[in-house]
Each structure stands twice: as C-alpha cells, then as structure tokens.
Amino acid sequence: MAVMIVLLIGVITFVAWYVHQHFNYWKRRGIPHDEPKIPYGNTSELMKTVHFADIFKRTYNKLRNKTDGPFVGFYMYFKRMVVVTDIDFAKTVLIREFDKFHDRGVFHNERDDPLSANLVNIDGQKWKTLRQKLTPTFTSGKMKTMFPTILTVGDELIRVFGETASADSDSMEITNVVARFTADVIGSCAFGLDCHSLSDPKAKFVQMGTTAITERRHGKSMDLLLFGAPELAAKLRMKATVQEVEDFYMNIIRDTVDYRVKNNVKRHDFVDMLIEMKLKFDNGDKENGLTFNEIAAQAFIFFLAGFETSSTTMGFALYELACHQDIQDKLRTEINTVLKQHNGKLDYDSMREMTYLEKVIDETMRKRPVVGHLIRVATQHYQHTNPKYNIEKGTGVIVPTLAIHHDPEFYPEPEKFIPERFDEDQVQQRPACTFLPFGDGPRNCIGLRFGRMQVIVGMALLIHNFKFEFHPTKTVVPLEYRTDDFLLSSKGGIHLKVTRV
C-alpha cells in the first residue's frame, strides 16, 4: 500500500511538473503571450462567449507592438502555437517557406471517420498527391462547363425571392434562402443531384449540411482532444463527423456513383471527375486513382466548404448593400449595363465583365471573412535570423485573417465598407498576404474559382431583380456573430426588406 501511495505521489508530481513546464514554454523563451489557463491555454472563452477569429484578433492587436519578432506565443489547450503579427512572416509561412509549414495539423481519422480525411484536413505526402490529382478538376475551363447548372439554380433563386417580394412580406430572412441556393448548386455540381432545397425549405441536404457544421459528435468537452491533441484523438479512434451526417453523405455518394457507372451516365460535373479517378484505382492505377472513401471525402468537403462559405458571404454582401444604398445603386447600374451589352443574357463572359461586383464581394470578404484564421504547423525546425524566434517542429502557426483584414496599416478605417479598396492601383500598393479569404500559397482553397463564380452569379441575379433595405426593427445593427460556430456567421440570421426593381 505504501508503495502504491509513493507511486501515485510520484505520478502526480510528474504530471504537475510537466503541465507547469508546458504552460511556461513561451515565458521561458521570452516571447510575449497572454497568461494561459489550465487546461484551456488561451482558449477558455472559445465557442462560449468569443469566436475563434476574435480571440486571435485580440491577441494580434494586444501583443503585436510588444514583440520584436514576427509572432507572439499562444496556447490552444495543450497545443503550443504562435500567432503571426508580421505580414512578411505570413508570406514566409504560406508561400516563401511553405515546405516547412505545409501541414495544418488538424484532426482527421481515415480509418474510423472517412469523411474527415479530406483535402482540407489531411497532411504530408498524402495531401500533396491528392491536391495534384484534384487540381485539374478546378480549372477555369471546367468551371465554365458548370456555369449553366449554376444559372439554372439561379432562376429558381429569383422565383423564391420573387414570391416573398410579391407577397409584400414585412421582412425576409435571407441567409436561409441563399444557403438553399448554394446547397442546390453544389448538390448538382458535386453530387449530380437535384436537391430541391429552394423549393423545399426542409430539404435534407440543407439540414445535413447545417448539422455537419454546427453540431459535434462528442460535445464541447472533447474539444480538448480534437483541437488540442488531434493525433492522440485519432489514435484513440475518435470520430468528429456526426454519425447521421456520415451515413447520409456516404449513402448519397455511393448511390450516385453506382447509378452512373451502371448506366453510363455523364453530366460533366465534379462527380464525373471523381468517378474517373475511382475507376483508375479499380483498374490498378493506384498512382492516379482514388478509393471510394477518398472520393466520398472530397465530395463531402466540396459540398460543405462551398455551401456554407458562399452563402454566408452572399448574406454579408446583401447586408452591406442594404446599409449602403449608394453602393447598391452603383452595382445595379453596372449589372444592368453589362447585361444590356449581352442582350440581357448572363453568361460566363458577361459575368467576368462585372468588375465592380467583384470588388463588392472582395470587400465583403475583407470585412467579414467567413474563415477568420488560417492554421499551419511547423513540419521541421524553422530557423529565424534571430534565434529567439526559431520555431520548433510541431508548433502550430496561426495566421489571423480577420485581424489582418482589420489592420488600419493595410486597410484605413477598416470598419467602413469601401469596395474601391480593390481598385487595381490600391491592390498593388498593399503587401502580399493582406487579403486571405481563400488562404494563399500552395495550400490555398482549391475551389476558390467555383466559390467566387456561384457568389457572383447569385449576387448578379439578385441585385438585377431586387432592392435590399434594412427593416426598421428586425435588422440587427451592428451585425452580431455566432460564437459557437467555427466559421464567421450571423447570429439570428439577416432580416431585410426585399422589393422588386
């Protein structure tokens, strides 16, 4: 018994020493940081009262002038990280020395949670190989073939908005409708399915997409492992994907693939491209092919990433245009002028002529980036010119997108909505990596062309047909964000008055 007590005391002493050493890492290094709280580190408010992006923004603003180096220290639970405070170092991490920071170090478990092992999450050579295989899928030529599909769904979007406007409704919650639009677009392009989300507000596709983003399989208590020790979580065979979501999407993808292969159906969409890779694998070409689980994971993340990010950006853009009627009028004039020059037809070429619309969308993503931070991990020791700022292998690196987008050094009066910030001459004057809605470098968003295209089409159709205004009592000013979502999204939706023009 005495031996057991001694051993127990020894274990407790060792754990206490280890925890103390771990949470004093940045203090020993002399790197500015906020005092951590065990076991949360600097994330005790995370997903409760403060959003991810706001925590990093606060750290950036509070400590950037207290460091003589390119970053400050940070603890995400037990994981030690740095928050980048120097824009040139952001370029180093994302582009210049990408070979040292090519992984994200986030949770994925290919064996037990196949949908988690997607292009966004996986690391190392597996990521590089998969990225090379998928890149041809997202060329401008391939995007052009998907344009008619987006336009068809766009017609349904106008019908739904028109019904609400014709009914002389008091106000309209727009985020739900534009989410159904992007769900139908991506459901068709990624899965080859007519999801009918716009015609049916309770459509399964939207419900499952929302569940996948907002709900957790294990609850907030397990964030400690999933975020703080993702490799350990995978070894413990944990899963992040909600079971209902996994079952729904795996069945949808399996049924779609089986039907197309058996019936030789071709739709020239994302699914066709994935099926080609699966058939290569099945025929022995493992170097260029993909397994079923691999194509399922890519179809899943393509839907998830494009569904929520694009619809949220559209909602934010409509909110800003309702707030700035002069900008909305100027944008409508451009859209109408371009359409008139193309005989009233919105096509791939006329879309590319709507340059002011692109600036409006860029300024929306600058002011309200849906993905508020980028995460990387040092895959090898990084040696800085000042040894104090060397980064050990395994250290996480946060590039705080929201903070950079609101830094007055790059964007004077950052809280103002000014599309002209994206005039060519102004863009050229800003350093690289000051605009990061899609990331940057080799690991930027592979679907950025598609995402921009569906947002531009949706916005062009809406502004051409409708006027958006604040409702005197239902529109929340200033806009509030949810704190329990990984992405930046509006709290309680966005309510606007919608009338035909």
Swiss-Prot record:
Keyword Endoplasmic reticulum: yes
One MF annotation (Gene Ontology) recorded for this entry: oxidoreductase activity, acting on paired donors, with incorporation or reduction of molecular oxygen
Gene Ontology cellular component annotations, sorted alphabetically: endoplasmic reticulum membrane
Listed SUPFAM superfamilies: Cytochrome P450
Pfam families: p450
Cofactor dependence: heme
Gene3D superfamilies: Cytochrome P450 (1.10.630.10)
GO biological process, one term: defense response to Gram-negative bacterium
Enzyme class: oxidoreductase
Record InterPro entries: Cyt_P450 (IPR001128), Cyt_P450_CS (IPR017972), Cyt_P450_E_grp-I (IPR002401), Cyt_P450_sf (IPR036396), Insect_CytP450_Detox (IPR050476)
Binding-site list for heme: 445
Membrane topology listed for this record: Peripheral membrane protein
Source superkingdom: Eukaryota
The entry's keywords: Endoplasmic reticulum, Heme, Iron, Membrane, Metal-binding, Microsome, Monooxygenase, Oxidoreductase
Subcellular locations according to the entry: Endoplasmic reticulum membrane; Microsome membrane
Enzyme nomenclature, EC number: 1.14.-.-
CDD domains for this protein: CYP6-like
Similarity comment: Belongs to the cytochrome P450 family.
Reported function: May be involved in the metabolism of insect hormones and in the breakdown of synthetic insecticides.
Protein name: Probable cytochrome P450 6a20
Source species of the chain: Drosophila melanogaster
Protein's gene: Cyp6a20
